[in-house]
Amino acid sequence: MPLSTVFLLALFLILVVIVVILLARTAVFPIDTAEVEPIELTQVDGESVAQRLGLAIQLKTFSSPNLEEIDPIPFRGMHNLMHTLYPMIDEKLDKEIFNEFSLLYTWKGSNPSLEPVCFLAHLDVVPADEAEDSGWKYPPFSGIVAEGYVWGRGAIDCKGVLIGQLEAVDNLLREGYQPLRTIYLAFGFDEENSGRNGAAQMAKALQQRGVKLSFLIDEGGAITTDQIKAVSQPVAAVGVSEKGFVTLRLHAKTASGHAAMPPKRTAIGALALALATLESNPFPQNLGVVQFMLSHLGKALPFMQRMALANTWLFGGLVRKQMASQPTMNALTRTTLAPTVINGGHTSNVLPAEADALINLRIMEGETREEVFQRVNNMVADDVISVLPSDAETLQESRSWNPSPVSEVDSPQFALLANLIMAAYPSTLVMPILVAGGTDARYYAPFCRNAYRFSPFVLSTEETANVHGVNERLSIANCAKAVGFYMELMRHVSSLTAEEEAAFLSEDEWEEDEKPVKERKNKAPRASKVVEPEEVLIAELHTPLPTKPLKQPASQTVAYPKQPRQVESPTEEHLTSRSENFVEDLQPLQDDDEPLTVKPMKRG
């Protein structure tokens, strides 16, 4: 046989082997989930809920890292409003106040031997520009209900979640519902400023009492209809972990002087060079998280994308490039770094002796704040530039934290949550995600393995972008459905018995082990089978269990007054009046997410 023929035959066989490997790995990549029967949620008057949410939005509950800087009046107004709108909650549940503003409610279950469940939200919001030319269609603290939405700061983050949970508890109390497991409602007041004085203190108190939580849900991902362009179905993003956080200060110090006779290195020039160097040398990518997330979309993900993600040994470079080109996906593949504040110089003809910049880093799963600090320090620190924590002398004392532990996705608690989402929002896919921002849930991680971050809202890309931005709003339909969702979730997670929990964890394993290999169900493969050895996966390569049908409770319709319940005078004095006047609709400001192309510069 001619040598050329042998070569071609060998090449053909190699190609066949490669194709077989590609197809085999692609075949086991998606995690297919059994279909769940749709359920009807409790019918709720969404407009009444929106009106009550509007009252909460009117309160300018701004937090601060320092307790003494917080205006107490809006928070007291919020407490009074909650008492006025939901008096039965104060009557039936035990209430504790932490650090003056945080609220911890305890709804005692009938079986105290079972681990409790916890629902989180926060009272505080970020500020909003109230100027007439700010771009808000309606004033940001009007709480006005118009065009099918309730408008204002905090509508989504996080007063919509807060009111949804309170409405759900109020409705269940009026139905006479008695939970099997104790239910905690934990509402912090400084989530937007790290949660140290709010959620952290409530979590500490619970842990000191020996509480171990069976389940916890906080704000987080939502149901989006157009964020994953390749998938036509709605996707519910459920946070199972969150990135770490640290802000570092770059400090440049040189001799001051006259601008007419600059030295070789100036403070501002050295600082600019350091920032350019950091932005041009991003942290390394890790595709494990993205693989884990997208595998849960099953075959809804197009074949070519599944093949690329399942075979990063061949397509890794292409996948990394694609991920890096999208800010949202890029944040899920690496620790991100962003300069946020810069200071230096006071007049045009004087060289400042010092200049500073703050850089915010969101730390990837598998890395620590100490490692991140060391990398930044090694890259830019020298005799002019020093790297320091932004608000303390040491990292341990600073407002920073490591990535949170990864919650279970093969637990009955996650299955209940995922099944309820799919049943309440038919055709929706459930995808575990790594949350890029910070939530209060991380403080409860030491005593809760099943902590999830999900807000039961169906949001467009625009609505998601408006969180912390201009024209934040929540639809009346979302207001109604969120209440029904929380009611069902509270029913299911609080009624989970120890026997059901044990059966869930053992039933499928026993059944699968007893069957011959060929007869076993097509169980979802562990994500470790589709990633390269060097990839570190979120969730320690969990395998979700097949879904189980939800128990459909008797459907009940909650009767609401046509008008929102009146607020008693102690609250009214702290509420701003609703204004019917509003500014014209302006184009919302757009963020420029284009990455810099600056390359590291040689220092002279």
Residue spans for each PLM region:
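Metal-dependent amide/peptide-bond hydrolase catalytic core
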Residues: 2-46, 51, 221-241, 245-487, ...
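Acidic/His- and Gly-rich active-site-bordering loop/insert found
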Residues: 8, 12-153, 174-180
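Structural motif
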Residues: 116-117, 214-215, 451
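Acidic/histidine-rich catalytic neighborhood of metal-dependent amide-processing enzymes
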Residues: 149-150, 154-237, 513
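Intrinsically disordered, low-complexity serine/threonine-rich segments
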Residues: 166, 506, 511, 569, ...
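Long, low-complexity, intrinsically disordered segments
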Residues: 536-542, 550-604
